[in-house]
Amino acid sequence: MSELKNMLDFTKEELENLVQPKFRAKQIFEWVYKKYADDFLQMSSLPKDFRVYLQKNFHFSPLKCVKDEKSKDGSIKYLFELLDGKKIEAVLLPMKEELVDENGKIIKHARYTICVSSQVGCKSGCSFCLTAKGGLSRNLSAGEIVGQILWIKKHNKIPYERRVNIVYMGMGEPLDNLKNVSKAVKILADNDALAISPRRQTISTSGLAKQIKELGEMNLGVLLAISLHAVNDELRSELMPINKAYNIASIMEAVRNFPIDQRKRVMFEYLLIDGINDKIEHAKELVKLLNGIKAKVNLILFNPHEGSLYNRPSVENAIKFQDYLSAKGVTCTIRESKGLDISAACGQLKERQSKQ
């Protein structure tokens, strides 16, 4: 393991306490996050002896891309190897294509969402998730989380000023690593770093009610997504063992008390699984659960993987489910499945790579 410190692990305030004079921290941040510098010696605005000091004591990112796969829909999945040899995944999702006029002038820039991992593996044990098979290995540091985004932006030549959305929906349970995830949020939001507003960062959780409360008390301004996937405790405990510790009632109570921008909604992710939770009776129960909550439901059609216990539902059933919710006044969308041809669901690329 390297004894060098990961520069991406530090907030600007922390860096100000390590380097003198303090304004050097701002300069370093601008080189790293705005100019995508990957060598301290390139930082020409810094004194040469200071650059040498940085080179001897810090590194930029422990990430090494060992495999990537590009889907026909433009999604790109990356498998990263960390300094200790552990592997994690991240995905670049193009949300809107670039628009140009007849003269080739850009009218609207392309928009992207980057899905990042927060842990190596996961201990939640969800029966439909491939990552859960291997259990939890360790938490990612803030720098390892930030590094995924920085690497993807740099290697896809996405300019610093181009807006991206961040979703903490990759490998791991983000709220099980709240300290480092919240630190990553702050680093990314810094105007001298990537300036990604917390309102463009969504933290997804399987429903850790205690940590939802802690996240709310931090008042970071992030968006919250709840991986619900079932409308009663019996079924949810079967699909998601974490429900035995935090049942649906406790999750809903935590959500009702969670501070969120009045212009935004709490997202509820609902994975539709054929014959398991995709019936109208489930939709009816979901409407009751969400009563009084400013919510948006994101329906996701199950993405099968090798050895999966479940099947993908029909599009027809998904539309019926959506129509029922919409008719009852619940904002609801069916998430466009991206990367089906590259196994872009969480843990699939890592699993395939390990078998090769």
Curated annotation (Swiss-Prot):
Cofactor note as given: Binds 1 [4Fe-4S] cluster. The cluster is coordinated with 3 cysteines and an exchangeable S-adenosyl-L-methionine.
UniProt keyword terms in alphabetical order: 4Fe-4S, Cytoplasm, Disulfide bond, Iron, Iron-sulfur, Metal-binding, Methyltransferase, rRNA processing, S-adenosyl-L-methionine, Transferase, tRNA processing
Leader sequence segment: none
Location(s) in or outside the cell: Cytoplasm
Catalytic residues (UniProt): 89 (proton acceptor), 346 (s-methylcysteine intermediate)
Disulfide bonds: 115-346
Binding-site residues for S-adenosyl-L-methionine, renumbered to this chain: 172-173, 204, 227-229, 303
Cofactor(s) of this protein: [4Fe-4S] cluster
Residues that hold [4Fe-4S] cluster according to the record: 122, 126, 129
Recorded GO CC terms: cytoplasm
EC assignment: 2.1.1.192
InterPro entries documented for this protein: Aldolase_TIM, Elp3/MiaA/NifB-like_rSAM, Methyltransferase_A, RlmN_N, RNA_MTrfase_RlmN, rRNA_lsu_MTrfase_RlmN/Cfr, rSAM
GO BP terms, alphabetized: rRNA base methylation; tRNA methylation
Molecular function GO labels: 4 iron, 4 sulfur cluster binding; metal ion binding; rRNA (adenine(2503)-C2-)-methyltransferase activity; rRNA binding; tRNA (adenine(37)-C2)-methyltransferase activity; tRNA binding
Domain called Radical SAM core: residue spans: 108-341
Catalytic activity field: adenosine(2503) in 23S rRNA + 2 reduced [2Fe-2S]-[ferredoxin] + 2 S-adenosyl-L-methionine = 2-methyladenosine(2503) in 23S rRNA + 5'-deoxyadenosine + L-methionine + 2 oxidized [2Fe-2S]-[ferredoxin] + S-adenosyl-L-homocysteine; adenosine(37) in tRNA + 2 reduced [2Fe-2S]-[ferredoxin] + 2 S-adenosyl-L-methionine = 2-methyladenosine(37) in tRNA + 5'-deoxyadenosine + L-methionine + 2 oxidized [2Fe-2S]-[ferredoxin] + S-adenosyl-L-homocysteine
A matching Pfam family: Radical_SAM
Record function comment: Specifically methylates position 2 of adenine 2503 in 23S rRNA and position 2 of adenine 37 in tRNAs. m2A2503 modification seems to play a crucial role in the proofreading step occurring at the peptidyl transferase center and thus would serve to optimize ribosomal fidelity.
Family: Belongs to the radical SAM superfamily. RlmN family.
PANTHER family recorded: 23S RRNA METHYLTRANSFERASE (PTHR30544), RADICAL SAM CORE DOMAIN-CONTAINING PROTEIN (PTHR30544:SF5)
Note: Reaction proceeds by a ping-pong mechanism involving intermediate methylation of a conserved cysteine residue.
Name by which UniProt lists this protein: Dual-specificity RNA methyltransferase RlmN
Species name: Campylobacter lari (strain RM2100 / D67 / ATCC BAA-1060)
Taxonomic placement: Bacteria, Pseudomonadati, Campylobacterota, Epsilonproteobacteria, Campylobacterales
Gene: rlmN
